[in-house]
Amino acid sequence: IFLTFISLFIGLQAYAAEESVYERVMRTGELRCGYVPWPGFVEIDPNTGKKEGVTVDYIEAIGKELDLKIIWAMETGWGNYAEGLRSNKYDVMCAGLWKSGQRAKISLLSRTLFYDNMFGFARADDIRFKNMPLENLNAPDFTITVIDGDITQAVRRADFPNAKEHSISADISAAQGVMSVVTKKSDIVFESIASINKYNDNADIKLVPINNEKPIRQFPVCIGMKPGEHDLKAMLDASIEALQVSGDFKKILSKYPELALSMERQK
């Protein structure tokens, strides 16, 4: 009897260990989100902790569509969010990710939610970049701030390999990237227009887009999951498509015109 009990106990442990994220979500009725504070996308009320922004609205709409409770479980970083997925600290990276091959290697990516632009920003008083062709940035005369392990680092290395790199840790606030340009530790930072507008609102030293105010890259924005969680991805993809077809996502985007997001890829 004792051996039978031990065998049963070990079997139950193995079963519990093998539970997928999808199975846990179905069992609990909850979807646990990792997130990164991102102006316009995920903003946190300092007094109440309430989350607001376009991707917050998107995720809450997905939760409603699937009859799942959304739990904003843990703050993470752009360069290390995949570690939290692998260690089951949260089920989905919900802040929104600029989709790339590099990120597809470390996380399972959903279908596209919408499209966002990445710009290069310099100090407003740095006249070197006024009307400068973008290809001229690929030179050792310029330093670009990137986040370790992030898509910004991949873009710098792919498009501007001859420029110098000023890297900041994935564990600290992305605002440090902005400040690196303000304090002249670097010349350029890659960011979304919303993040820089938020900074410029109260800043003495303003940042402005280079490249004649044209984006460096346009990215599809998605959410990320633990590699191998294809059942979870299928469920989330189906709900994303349903909300796109119903027009619900378009209504959400219309609330945030200042973010200049689009449902379709711009040519």
Predicted segment positions?
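Periplasmic-binding protein-like
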Residues: 114-122, 193, 200-241, 258-267
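Hydrophobic residues within well-ordered alpha-helices
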Residues: 62, 85-86, 137, 178-182, ...
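Bacterial N-terminal signal peptides
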Residues: 1-11
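A ligand-binding cleft/hinge motif common to bilobed small-molecule-binding domains
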Residues: 79, 96-105, 154-158, 180-217
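Flexible hinge/capping segments at coil-to-helix
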Residues: 124-143
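Ligand-binding clefts/hinges and TM-proximal coupling segments of bilobed small-molecule sensing domains
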Residues: 16-19, 149-166, 204-209, 240-267
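Extracytoplasmic small-molecule ligand-binding "clamshell" domains
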Residues: 17-97, 105, 167-170, 255-256
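Short amphipathic alpha-helical coupling segments at ligand-binding clamshell hinges
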Residues: 54, 58, 140, 192, ...
